[in-house]
Amino acid sequence: MKGKVSRNDRLNGEFQKEIYEIIQRKLKNPLVTEMFSITKVDASRDLSHAKVFVSIYSTDETKKMNTFNAIESDAKKIRYELSKVIRARTVPELHFFLDDSMEYGDKMEKLFKAINEGDKT
């Protein structure tokens, strides 16, 4: 079984790519002002629901939340557009989650650097 990719994994990858394209190129919501990426999509086995993790790159927390809320409010439009490009019997209901793992990683890296610099003195 080594090297085999499950149908669900393949669809998750397609969903991830297509959701980004739909938000960026088709919907063009003027409220999406910050740079973002779809970091992960996790669809249920029956494709009834999918968790969509969004990472938003912004130092302004208000703009970040406004961008996330704009993406989240377009969930039904995104699902409709997704149904046009994905070859699957059903397209999952999309649930968006803010992914702060990049920011957490940056904070940890800064902490480690500060610790290392403190050890040198």
Where are the regions that the model predicts?
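Charge-rich, low-complexity N-terminal segments
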Residues: 1-49, 55-121
